[in-house]
């Protein structure tokens, strides 16, 4: 995919009006026109309540089709509306990636009794006290769906842990007891063992669970004619299962079926270890780069821009990195809040959209709105998306050689007329830098397209020119079309 761009088509605070799928269908042509090549849609299945964003999973087979949890539709609409949106996206040449939430379930239909041990929330390997009988919300019969699509019913023994025990009068994490019951290996080591995240923790060591989830993966991909998946909460899921799961889905859908995982850690080595564990079968969101962008936006001119890409996934594994600025987890008010400050977002998007490496993802909240308030960044994003589609080709030459003013050039190529560009970013004062765009551009007239400068410049005989940028801004210089 040449210069592909993903869009995350939701944010955390969308209204519970059931209209997102209809909006997405109507928006498909516009997305194509601005250069979006794939859309990551939110969790499409029934949650424990209608207003939930989809991560509090109740029934993975209910895509807004059955009357369950007091509603037929999900927060985003009905199954029929979803299918129409997917069709519209495909008609416009846009791939569809499903948000795949397999780690946890909640909203059980009835309680069950079982033996469990409370564990220390800061060290889940540390048991607090002897096993006791508890009553938890772990039984799932799916009365609205019955056996349609799958006869599988969930019980306490399909989970490794739970916080869905209430008769004790406190919210605690319990390790469920029974044959073979333990926290999974192949998960993040935070809190001793980070298998458990929330709700009822799906046991990926249980053979019935493994087979059912693999079957579901094929079903959901085929049912929605999906082109890929965004895999949620990988820190908490046994990595061997993910490798097996993706192998199984691709056996059905083809080896080109795409997958990107969410491994929320700013530590590059943790992401590298995960990629090794799953044999590099999937891409990962470049969380280390996100945290770099967040820190840079917080520190302003005190941040050393020369280090912006150090120890990031896109620097070390460029073909496996999905670059992003913000998402629903990082936005203000979310549990993992680390929202990049508004002044720096144009610089951050200029970086990820115009650089050669990485697969950039544009956040709905940055392009459209967050909490219903229109985004101020849409105009600059339209400019950058157009530049990516028409200008960002050829080899890249980096100029990360100043603590406050950095940039790169793209040389362009013969297949894309007028391609090539020069990008400068400044987190301090006005800056300038002599950069080379290549002798093939000698004597061309270039201009700045974000509105920072009205003047033009001429590329020298040696392919170099003095490019300028205003303080705290970005500048994108391109050839002026005849």
Where do the language-model regions lie?
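Boundary/entry segment of secreted carbohydrate-active catalytic domains
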Residues: 1-18, 196-205
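Active-site-proximal helices and loops of the catalytic beta/alpha 8
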Residues: 2-7, 23-36, 45, 49-64, ...
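Soluble non-cytosolic domains of exported or imported proteins
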Residues: 15-22, 76, 80, 207, ...
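Active-site-proximal N-terminal segment of extracellular/periplasmic enzymes that hydrolyze or transfer
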Residues: 16-23, 27, 107-109
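Aromatic/His-enriched, Gly/Pro-containing loop or helix-boundary segments
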Residues: 62-88
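Core domains of carbohydrate- and sulfate-ester-processing enzymes
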Residues: 118-193
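Active-site-adjacent "subsite" loops/lids of carbohydrate-active enzymes
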Residues: 178-223, 234
